[in-house]
Amino acid sequence: ASATWGAAYPACENNCRKKYDLCIRCQGKWAGKRGKCAAHCIIQKNNCKGKCKKE
């Protein structure tokens, strides 16, 4: 799901993708800390959705 999220919001992707990609890398590299990384990802994703709606 995380891999296709950006495609659903093309207008915001460039603005948010860098920070969101950090989440994806975090989830991939730190499996033991996935809960913390996932929580950060959810926050980041919601922030980007909010920006997208405003645009």
UniProtKB/Swiss-Prot annotation:
The alphabetized UniProt keywords are: Disulfide bond, Hydroxylation, Ion channel impairing toxin, Neurotoxin, Secreted, Toxin, Voltage-gated sodium channel impairing toxin
Q: Where can this protein be found?
A: Secreted
The effect annotated for residue 13 to Q is:
No change in toxicity
Recorded consequence of changing residue 33 to N: No decrease in toxicity
Impact of changing residue 30 to F on the protein?
No change in toxicity
Q: Kindly list the GO molecular function terms attached to this UniProt entry.
A: sodium channel inhibitor activity; toxin activity
Specify one Pfam family: Toxin_13
Give the sites modified to Hydroxyproline.
10
**Disulphide bonds in the chain:** 12-52, 16-48, 23-41, 26-37
Q: What is the effect of changing residue 9 to F?
A: 5-fold decrease in toxicity
Q: What is the effect of changing residue 17 to A?
A: Complete loss of toxicity
The consequence of residue 29 to N is: No change in toxicity
Name the GO cellular-component terms.
extracellular region
Mutation effect (residue 17 to K) = Complete loss of toxicity
Q: Which domain of life is it from?
A: Eukaryota
Give the family this protein belongs to, as stated in its UniProt record: Belongs to the worm B-toxin family.
As for what it does, the entry says:
This toxin increases the excitability of nerves by delaying the inactivation of the voltage-gated sodium channel (Nav). Only acts on some crustacean. Is more abundant, but 15-fold less toxic than neurotoxin B-II.
| Comment field on protein domains | Has the structural arrangement of two alpha-helices stabilized by disulfide bonds (CSalpha/alpha 4(S-S)).
Q: What is this protein called in UniProt? A: Neurotoxin B-IV
